[in-house]
Amino acid sequence: MNNEILQRMVENLSEEKFGRTFQHRAYFNKRLRTTGGRYLLKSHDIEINPKQYEHYGEDAVVKIILHELCHYHLHIAGKGYQHKDQDFKRLSQQVGAPRFCNSIESYQQRANYEYYCTKCHAKYIRIRKVDTNRMRCGHCNGKLRMKRQLK
């Protein structure tokens, strides 16, 4: 799937499910890491994570598009477009747009560092490096030490 096919898919879904046209750009953005897609407020464009298509196929992309189109149409109409707004919740339920997409990598797979407590030996895995002078064990308040760097 390329950007042209994605653009047509977004335009068709907008007409079918919302009865309104999509007049901006939709494209894949390979820099997206932790989200399936996003709606850009300033340019009104929609970006989709290509990894979602590679891992879960076209059905996952359709669900992400529906979710982002809810943001798009509500924002254009001047209604509540954020996840917390009732307008968004109502519209996403009407069109069958999910609140979340499937994650590509679990936290365990993304983790880079493993720490342990010197007192109770509790294990902590983290994506980002932790300042062991400032952070303490959540169980016993003991000191943390880096056990190993995973990647």
From Swiss-Prot:
Recorded GO MF terms: zinc ion binding
GO terms for biological process, alphabetical: response to stress
Record's subcellular location: Cytoplasm
Occurrences of domain SprT-like (ranges): 6-147
Spans through the membrane: none
Pfam families: SprT-like, Zn_ribbon_SprT
Protein name: Protein SprT-like
Organism from which the protein derives: Staphylococcus aureus (strain MRSA252)
Top-level taxonomy: Bacteria, Bacillati, Bacillota, Bacilli, Bacillales
